[in-house]
Structures are given as C-alpha cells and as structure tokens.
Amino acid sequence: MSKGKLGEKISQFKIVEELKAKGLYAYFRPIQSKQDTEVKIDGRRVLMFGSNSYLGLTTDTRIIKAAQDALEKYGTGCAGSRFLNGTLDIHVELEEKLSAYVGKEAAILFSTGFQSNLGPLSCLMGRNDYILLDERDHASIIDGSRLSFSKVIKYGHNNMEDLRAKLSRLPEDSAKLICTDGIFSMEGDIVNLPELTSIANEFDAAVMVDDAHSLGVIGHKGAGTASHFGLNDDVDLIMGTFSKSLASLGGFVAGDADVIDFLKHNARSVMFSASMTPASVASTLKALEIIQNEPEHIEKLWKNTDYAKAQLLDHGFDLGATESPILPIFIRSNEKTFWVTKMLQDDGVFVNPVVSPAVPAEESLIRFSLMATHTYDQIDEAIEKMVKVFKQAEVETLI
C-alpha cells in the first residue's frame, strides 16, 4: 500500500522486518500437532510452556468425541447470530450451566473472549459515565471501554489507594464501573478483590471481573476470582473465556438476569456476530462437566505450578509477584527477550515473549505457563535449558 498518509504509516512499521533480519522473529509460529505438553514445530519435538490450556483438556478424548457428536447432529456452523437464527438448544444449555457454575442468575455467550469484553463495556456505559481500569487490564477491556465513549480512567496496577483516590474525584451521581482482570495475563498476580469491592461499594460503583485466566484455575471447582475470595455477591459481572481451561473457543458474561437480558438486545458483538459453532459449544459443555466432577485436574495444575516455581526460584529467576500458573520470567530487555525466546525454541522449549508496548521495556519477560498434564521431567528439562540460555544471553536478572 503506497497511498498517502496510510501508506506512509505502513512503510514506517519496521520492527517485524528488523526482527526477521536478526533471526529473532517469534510470532505466528506454525505448530504441526495438537496443543499438548509437547508439540511438533518444523518436524521437531518442542516442549510447550506457552499454552493457555491450563488443565490440558484440549486433547481429552471425551471432549473431542463431544465435538464430533455435535458436528454430526448440528453441522459445522449456525449460519447466523444468536439474535436471529443462530441459537441452538445447546447454547441455552451452556448459558444455564455457566451461570450456575459462577453463581449468577443468567449468562450470555459470545463467539470469542475478546467480544465478551467488547459487548458489555461498549453498551452498558456511555458518554457521561466513567470506566476505571487497572493499567494492566487486557486489550479487549481497553478497546471495549473506548467503544463506549465513556470517560476512561486508569489506576495503578492493583493499587487500591490509587483507585480510591480517582473514584473520590468523580461526580457522586455518575455511573461508574470498575473493570479488572482476575488473574493478570502477563504478570500472573491476582486482583486484590476484597479491597476493590469494598471501595466499589463505598463509591456506588459496579464491578466487572475478567476471569479469562481464572476459570478452571482458582475458586471452588475452578469457578474463578469471585468464588476464590467468596465475593460473588459483590461482583456484578463475571466474564470468562473458553479458549483456556475450557479447551474450546468463545466466551461469556454472567450477572443479574435483567442485565444479561439488556446485553442480549444491546451488545453488538452478540447481535451482529455469528454464534459459537456447535462443536465449540459441545466441547465447552463437556470440559465444564469434567472440571466440576474431576478436581484432580486443578490439583495437578497447582502441584506443577508450585514445583516449577520452587525450581525456578532456586535457580535465581526473577518471577515477580505471580500467584498463578502464569510464571513471568523477567528479562527486562526487549532484544534479549526475543533472543532468549528464539534460542529456547531452537533448543526445544516454547515460551511466549512479552515486550513493549504490552509491558514497559524494563519489564519485558518470557511467559512460562504450566499445564496440569506437564510432567516433572518435562519441567526439569525446560528449566535446565532455560538456565543455559539465560547464561548465554547474560541476563542480569538471573542471580
């Protein structure tokens, strides 16, 4: 594209070209196998420590069978939005089971997790309203807030004093919504929900929690952040995704029945998007059943997390304040982060680089994520290789 200012903007985007020239490009890496603890890349075995499949259910034969059965019964797609011809009986069944799971009156499905934040934020709030966001909230929360045309205010990461100060300066009679990640996707720490909800009640603000990385990980039977703290009644909206612990694709929002009914008829990402495919719905239903009936998956996830965290700390890795299976290993240099990611893949370990602008350059890191299905031998092998690569890269954060 070479037309005018748009062409100029495109031509100035050089980072991909520069990384490829250095052999450090680490995105869109094609995987030739199932998303499991070991994957195949370029025909080679690679240990997978970059997946969000926390419970390792993407390869569960019962879930695969449920998806196959749904394909036979309903076909490959719904050919319309939920608002019109795209609602199946299994959509309704899943909504009912999800709302009961997270302790809310009702739920509405979205075709992706990203849309699950876009929809509520963009239609519930308006020009004279205020949305308060943690500065480390997911991009979908930020974009949904922008689409609402409301006044967006960011507070310091998990900084409740800053949140209180910013709420105190807002008009008392204004509509206010605090939206936060439950488990933060880059750092792995958990929101201080007890203090946040206390402040919200003090200032008459609603609360929405993004449980994308919390479902299947924390809370009673993996029911998420509000359940983890026993604060279901203090959280107005719970958002979750199916692409992580629930081994599928899509998302949902749960809350009071009247709010969900409002979303069904006003959230554009429901009304103008084709509905979740039958196979995705059926696989989510089966995964939800497994999570609720087989606690050993979550127990094993946490055993692996505790084991890996202890081993990494013993070797001197900087893990920040993580409290979850997301282990951020800080490198604090964009270029070294890319170099470490590439060298680890060459050595058979897949991790995800997190660099600016996703985080400040001085907080760049690799994200090392655990699955319930990892073995201790796999964890040991990956850490041994990381120690070697970090030393080769002269990463200063390695003690």
UniProtKB/Swiss-Prot annotation:
Topology versus the membrane: Peripheral membrane protein
Q: In which domain of life is the source organism classified?
A: Bacteria
Give GO cellular component annotations, separated by semicolons: cytoplasm; plasma membrane
EC numbers: 2.3.1.50
Q: A GO BP term, please?
A: sphingolipid metabolic process
> Looking at the keywords, is Ubl conjugation present?
no
Instruction: Kindly tell me the pathway this chain contributes to.
Output: Lipid metabolism; sphingolipid metabolism
Family as reported in the entry's similarity comment: Belongs to the class-II pyridoxal-phosphate-dependent aminotransferase family.
Protein's recorded name: Serine palmitoyltransferase
